[in-house]
Every structure is written in C-alpha cells, then in structure tokens.
Amino acid sequence: MAATSSYTACTKFSMLGWIGGKRELRKRRAFFISAQQQAEVEESQQVNAQEEEQEKMKQQGKQKLPRPVEPQVNVKSKNMSREYGGQWLSSVTRHVRIYAAYIDPVTCEFDQTQMDKLTLILDPTNEFVWTSETCNKVYAYFQELVDHYEGAPLTEYTLRLIGSDIEHYIRKLLYDGEIKYNMNARVLNFSMGKPRILFNDGLPQNVQ
C-alpha cells in the first residue's frame, strides 16, 4: 500500500501556555541507610529490574494499536476563530504533516475550529510502501507523543517536536526493514539514504 493515509488524535494541549504556570521542581530529599540495608536495596532493585525487563518483553510482543477516533459527518471547512487570529497551526516535513484541525479522511474538508484534535497525514508523496500494520505503528507512536505532551502549549514548536520524533521513527522502520521505498513513486531521491543490499556470506556471489 503506497496511498497516503491520515489519523486524527484528540489532544489535551493548553492554548494559554502551560497549565497552572511554571511547573514546580520536586524537592530533593537526602537519606542515609546502613550497609545491610544497602544490600537489601540492591537486591530489591535487581528483582525489580528483571520484572521490568520481562514486562517490556511482554509489551513488545503485543501489537500497539492507535485509539479509535469516531468519524464525523457533514464536516465543513472552517478557519480558526478570530480570537486566535486565524493562525495556521501546522508542522510539515517530508513524510509527516500535522495540523491542529479535524480533516475528513474522505472529503478532505478542513475544520480548523476543532483545535482539540491533531490530524496526521502520513507520507503524502508516497515515497514508501506501507501496510496497515506499519501505518498503525506510526499512528500509535503519534498517539503516545500526543499523550506525552499533554499540557504543553499548542504551538507550532510543539507540533514540530512531535513531527521530528515521527520522522526518526519512520527512519527506524526503514532501517529495520519494516517499510521499503516505493520504486513506483513519482520521484526517487531516497531521502532517508540509498537502499542497502544484504548479502549472505555463506553463499558464493556471482562475480565476473
């Protein structure tokens, strides 16, 4: 699948700066323990580390799916309200376009008044070949980033941070062999590096 796809995530960003003003730093507390307690603590930490590693393995085995978003009907293109100056909040890179709006995936109607939603348009130039599984991986990662930046100001800078992280994630998928270049794309410029060919050292190569 090389067609462009999109995904919309609900946000809890702040449009008036950081919620509650500046975040207070947690107070640092010093404490002292005996040598016996130190050994018990180290043993407990090792057990906890093993349990965390096992839990990570279990989570990696499960395929992450993005949270479903209820589709809307009769969506009409609307600009931002006057109180926000009609500004265009977006982050556009080669493979990731993020808009602070709801975009109908069928009609492409653009409703900028729904600022509580971020719409991701993935690989608009069809440079890569995507499957539903790899698309869902990107969408799930996008949802994780949106949750991570909860409470952050809704600005282009925040959207660029999210878009940059997704670009790095797409590069990782390419290097891991989960996606590949679309050789039928309109332009082949291999923006994330030239394709790499892996040889099997156990088999002789035909060399003339």
From Swiss-Prot:
One of its GO terms (molecular function) is oxidoreductase activity, acting on NAD(P)H, quinone or similar compound as acceptor. Its main location: plastid. InterPro entries: NdhM. It is an enzyme of class 7 (translocase). Its EC number is 7.1.1.-. It holds the Pfam family NdhM. Residues 1-21 form a transit peptide. Residues 37-70 are annotated as: Disordered. Keywords: Chloroplast, Membrane, NAD, NADP, Plastid, Plastoquinone, Quinone, Thylakoid, Transit peptide, Translocase, Transport. The keyword NADP applies. It is a peripheral membrane protein. Residues 37-49 have a biased composition (Low complexity). One of its GO terms (cellular component) is chloroplast thylakoid membrane. It is found in: Plastid, Chloroplast thylakoid membrane. It catalyses: a plastoquinone + NADH + (n+1) H(+)(in) = a plastoquinol + NAD(+) + n H(+)(out); a plastoquinone + NADPH + (n+1) H(+)(in) = a plastoquinol + NADP(+) + n H(+)(out). NDH shuttles electrons from NAD(P)H:plastoquinone, via FMN and iron-sulfur (Fe-S) centers, to quinones in the photosynthetic chain and possibly in a chloroplast respiratory chain. The immediate electron acceptor for the enzyme in this species is believed to be plastoquinone. Couples the redox reaction to proton translocation, and thus conserves the redox energy in a proton gradient. Belongs to the NDH complex subunit M family. Part of the chloroplast NDH complex, composed of a mixture of chloroplast and nucleus encoded subunits. Component of the NDH subcomplex A, at least composed of ndhH, ndhI, ndhJ, ndhK, ndhL, ndhM, ndhN and ndhO. This is NAD(P)H-quinone oxidoreductase subunit M, chloroplastic. It comes from Vitis vinifera. The gene is ndhM.
